[in-house]
């Protein structure tokens, strides 16, 4: 797999390449889950050009060097990846989309923006907490207690896998657990975002001069889509697609619908 790094350590790994000039940069959610979580999304996308899996420095398996502070330039360091390649379309899942909307310097540097199961502000978080209280998962609660007592990678992985019923529809639970079980979790990235971003976030820009794809699973229980009802986000450049029968990773339950949405988005980009 071809791998490139920006000067600050943003990692871009080439997933696939078809004929065409576009460069698709896929940014994972979490944070701390790693771009490996978007492998199935990249597999589902039948788009022209190159698809790259992107990890911020210190996120997922993109580990920082000893003594460095990989989070010092989060999330603005995303600009470096956009400047490293021509004809870039950024796609951010969940918190990844929030990081993109917190980086106004991207304006004028990208040809399109895909926002996948994400939100324009942090109002999604109390709604998520309320959902977990309405529909508790005892195994998740036990895993949280174990991780807090002993914050190992094994305990963190167990915790996330125990949340699968919130993330996936029943028919996709086996695939969802397998996905969550093989991710390179990064506790430091999770802790940084919780302390410095997740509870303060509000979008710092909204592009109106490039195509925007807003895509979400119609049964996503993790990130509420309610805040998108604000009129400033109902601009003519937006392609909005609810993916039927899908949760927080809609390409797992319904890859065909996700593929079709990206095909329509590509038509908008290429004119």
Specify the residue positions occupied by each region the protein language model found.
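Conserved alpha/beta-hydrolase catalytic His-Asp/Glu region
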Residues: 148-195
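Conserved hydrolase catalytic core segment
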Residues: 86-127
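Flexible "cap/lid" loop of the alpha/beta hydrolase fold
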Residues: 113-147, 190
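Catalytic histidine-centered segment of alpha/beta-hydrolase-like enzymes
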Residues: 243-259
